[in-house]
UniProtKB/Swiss-Prot annotation:
Key word Mitochondrion present: no
Protein family (similarity comment): Belongs to the ferredoxin--NADP reductase type 2 family.
Cofactor note as given: Binds 1 FAD per subunit.
Full protein name: Ferredoxin--NADP reductase 2
Subunit structure, as described in the record: Homodimer.
Stored Pfam families: Pyr_redox_2
Signal peptide: none
Organism per entry: Cupriavidus metallidurans (strain ATCC 43123 / DSM 2839 / NBRC 102507 / CH34)
Sequence intervals crossing the membrane: none
Single annotated GO MF: NADP binding
Keyword tags: FAD, Flavoprotein, NADP, Oxidoreductase
Cofactor: FAD
Length: 367
């Protein structure tokens, strides 16, 4: 899925031609990862008049912010007292509009080869090919997949009655809902959907949680008020009728297996992060993270940079704002590869007419 996004939406609404199996696209910068840091990397490169293409294994823009906590508040973005993951993504997309980046979604990088001319040949899992002067790895924890419910055959209901994330909460209103898991996501959605779903049953393998104590206390209070149920146990089987999931079989801590009617199952077992093909690029790794310098956030391979949660260096902090800082220095570090004969001058968006032109804004006149 290849697209350009000229407005702040995080889904694929504007198509742009790809080149699966065709001639490689010759570009200046390729960003791997369309999360907040990858999106801000587009902005910092754009200020230096470097156009970027972005690859992401997900089919939507926003990375973990949109995949894991689109509606959860974020409090530590400078000058933004509070925003959700989706709002942060939408604002970043709005911010990078002037630079018209091209997104290649739902695909992973499968091949990276250094060419004799110093550029890189890159190919994705969908056959999209590039020849690029620089690569920026902003892949967070790498590609990640939800840990799934291990019940034989139940996967056929995924996306219909079995879900690993909530895209539309109203989908579960008026339904008999089972929520499985013991972390914050499981508790948060349980509490949110009580009173909206027809019934809510929470199932966890033990009577202990990896979640905020206040959420656990609220859940137990709702159980006492008969607003929902909590059960210690594990799902071991299911029943269906005419291709529709109708019941699950839950084995409790007492060893007894009980049948439970169900319309939908929400599973929150966490995510399994994987570096995937990145681990095979010849990069220096430390505990599955990419080592970089702190001057340019360049890896051991000249021309390949790593920003955000995927990198490591002394004093590293996995914060979105740290990733933004890294993206700025990485852009300046990459400029000599793209403009070898051009001296890069430090300019400020507050005062530079050149940057105002790049951003498509008018230069203010002060009396």
């Amino acid at each position: 899925m290849d697209l350009s996004i000229p407005n702040p939406v995080a889904d694929a609404t504007h198509q742009a031609g790809g080149n699966p199996g065709g001639q490689p696209l010759e570009i200046d910068a390729l960003i791997v990862g369309a999360g907040p840091v990858g999106l801000f990397q587009v902005f910092e490169l754009g200020l230096l008049e470097i156009k970027a293409h972005i690859i992401d294994s997900l089919k939507v823009v926003g990375g973990q912010c949109v995949e894991l906590y689109p509606d959860k508040p974020i409090y530590d973005i400078p000058a933004v007292p509070i925003c959700t993951g989706q709002e942060l993504t939408d604002n970043l997309l709005k911010q990078i509009e002037p630079f018209s980046p091209t997104f290649h979604l739902g695909q992973e990088v499968s091949v990276v080869e250094r060419r004799e001319d110093g550029r890189f040949f890159v190919e994705t899992s969908l056959g999209t090919r590039f020849i690029t002067k620089t690569i920026f790895i902003a892949a967070g924890v790498g590609s990640f997949q939800p840990r799934t419910l291990k019940v034989e055959g139940i996967d056929k209901f995924e996306g219909k009655q079995l879900f690993y994330r909530v895209k539309d909460p109203s989908r579960f209103h008026g339904r008999n809902l089972v929520v499985v898991g013991g972390g914050d996501s499981a508790l948060d959605w349980t509490l949110d959907l009580v009173g909206k779903a027809e019934s809510v049953v929470m199932i966890h393998r033990r009577d202990g949680f990896r979640a905020a104590p206040a959420s656990v206390a609220k859940m137990r209070e709702l159980c006492e008020q008969m607003e929902m149920q909590f059960m210690v146990g594990q799902i071991g089987g299911y029943e269906e009728k005419d291709g529709v999931l109708t019941e699950i079989k839950v084995t409790g801590a007492d060893g007894v297996t009980r049948r439970m009617p169900v319309d939908d199952i929400l599973v929150f077992f966490g995510l399994s992060p994987k570096l995937g093909p990145i681990a095979e690029w010849g990069l220096d790794l430390e505990r599955k993270q990419i080592k970089v310098d702190t001057e340019k956030f360049e890896t051991n391979i000249p021309g390949i940079f790593a920003v955000g949660d995927i990198n490591t260096y002394p004093g590293k902090k996995k914060l979105i704002l740290s990733g933004f800082h890294e993206a700025a220095l990485a852009a300046f570090g990459a400029a000599p590869y793209i403009f070898p004969d051009k001296k890069i001058h430090m300019q400020y968006t507050t005062t530079s007419p050149k940057l105002h032109k790049v951003l498509g804004v008018e230069t203010p006149v002060f009396d």
